[in-house]
């Protein structure tokens, strides 16, 4: 057979070995988080945002997962502890995951037991306007959550203001980059 003649007997095999997870929960298990309760999964063009908690613990967590044709891969996460104390004192609880080389935006999310919490306003000093996040039912019945994410958020310093449907402030906290300040709100009064 000549150098440029076609050989019809050659067969090429392409094999793909998939080491990534096929679901977001499987990706979390592969990252060492076995017993999680997914509160909300938000699929975006850039990846998947997962808001979850570990049953029996007083915390909420965020994770960002890469998602492509090979599956899901855990990239980064954040945990906020003592959420019930935070909500009792400030009227709301939150967790934040900073933007990075792997995560295209800063993410704020929270959980609440206050049925009167309708919306959370996220403000940062660079903005002249607040970003609103409506409170909605999570994947777990009876659990209310909220989420806001933007590539414009820096996460360096911020305020979170919880509003009732009537626009009354029922939650308020701020972070100046080094210290969290809780503005005490009597949430019993708002009910």
Task: Show where each model-derived region lies.
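Long, contiguous interaction/targeting segments characteristic
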Residues: 1-88
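Short amphipathic beta-strand and strand-loop transition segments with alternating hydrophobic
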Residues: 36-42, 93-99, 134-136
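Ser/Thr-rich low-complexity repeats and stalk/linker segments
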Residues: 33, 119-190
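Short acidic/glycine-enriched loop/turn segments that link adjacent beta-strands
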Residues: 44-48, 104, 142
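Short beta-strand-to-loop capping motifs
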Residues: 52-54, 112, 149-152
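Short, surface-exposed coil-to-beta transition loops
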Residues: 58-61, 104-107, 132, 156-157
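Structural motif
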Residues: 109-116
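Extracellular ectodomain segments of secreted/surface proteins
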Residues: 82-109, 180-190
